[in-house]
Amino acid sequence: MNVNRVRIEKLQEEMKALGMDMYLVPTADFHQSEYVGAYFKVRAWLSGFTGSAGTLVVTRDSAYLWTDGRYFIQAGKELEDTGVTLMKMREEGVPTVDEFLKENIPAGGCLGCDGRTISISQGKAYADMMEKKQGRFLCQDDLGGKIWDDRPMMSREQAFLVDVKYVGRSREEKLADVRRTMKENGANTHLLSSLDDIAWLLNIRGNDIECNPVILSYVILTEQDVFFYVQEEAVSPAVREELEKAGITILSYFRVYEDVKKFKDEDTVLLDESVVNYALFEKIPGSVKKVDGINPSKPMKAMKNRVERENVRTAHI
């Protein structure tokens, strides 16, 4: 029997044990990155489709894969004999993923996914849909990971710092800029999970995603403190020393899911609901005020300073 068919059947057994009607597997890491490392390629491992964009939906007795026109031929070949039906996005008569879910999940049913792989805005939409159906939305279960026995380790390539001569502003200056924007938004805390923003803010780079110089990490920024959640094996003593000089506390990558539970009632947290993952959001106490807004670093990063402009010219001449 086709190996991917076997994997999907194992997933369906896990779903059945939890009373799930459908399980959603997007192409995503825990940071909504466009490209993902080997550890996060659950959709590809389950379905056999290796393209960079696609969403797998598994029901109790079938499976469906949505992808765009770039991959119709590739997906058709790779999904052969897997039992997965190819759903050609934006083709006439083909529903979107959300339309399919809404139409096919029964009243009182259950939708599941790994909540770390969807954004807050997506999670809220699915939760609202299931509430209207008087059903359940389970977002704490990584069922693909549960059955993936030889799953690759999460990347932990060595991080390195970028000298201010290349970027024009120190991490201390950038942190001060972001804190001013936080204050303007009435927030005393900022939860940051987009990897490019973290790389820019802390003047740090990594190699955790192929061809993307980023490091898997989260940041919690308060009025006084900076907490950098990262796989500590990726941080050398020299890098740690430099970050600590800037008042940055280095903590283990997954600890952020516990620390957000400690936000206080009087805190106001600025976060981008299109980027921060839903599972992390669900850990924040409901009594804590949240402000949905674009990461302050996003427009700052887009406006190149004199040093950056000069270095861009140098790199292209």
Question: Predicted regions span which residues?
Answer:
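Terminal domain-start leader segments
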Residues: 1-317
